[in-house]
């Protein structure tokens, strides 16, 4: 028996919306971090945690975040410009 408000696409839609909200909030973090990687270079991204900074840098570099876990995350100067949130997701 299915709930009254259940439809086949509701779980996928709910998950997509949750992922989009998490991504939006990750990019709105007030902190700044410089993420450096030997193969991809360096980028300044919003920073709520080191993992969030790596996730944001992976989006900018268009790579899987698991492949850049060896990246270094450093505190960035507040005057440095932050990379824009990519639209390609």
PLM-predicted stretches and their roles:
Residues 2-6, 13, 62-89:
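Short, mixed-charge low-complexity intrinsically disordered segments
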Residues 2-27:
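Charged, low-complexity intrinsically disordered regulatory segments in eukaryotic signaling
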Residues 15, 21-23, 33, 49, ...:
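Short, flexible coil/linker segments at or flanking structured domains
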Residues 20-41:
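Short aromatic-glycine-(Arg/Gly/Cys) micro-motifs in beta-strand/loop hairpins
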Residues 41-48:
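Short, contiguous acidic and Ser/Thr-rich linear segments
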């Amino acid at each position: 028996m299915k709930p009254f408000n259940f439809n086949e696409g509701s779980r996928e839609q709910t998950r997509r919306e949750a992922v989009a909200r998490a991504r939006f909030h990750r990019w709105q973090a007030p902190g700044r971090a410089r993420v450096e990687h030997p193969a991809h270079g360096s980028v300044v991204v919003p920073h709520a945690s080191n993992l969030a900074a790596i996730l944001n840098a992976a989006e900018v570099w268009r790579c899987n975040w698991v492949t850049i876990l060896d990246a270094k995350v450093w505190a960035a100067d507040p005057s440095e410009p932050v990379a824009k949130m990519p639209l390609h997701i």
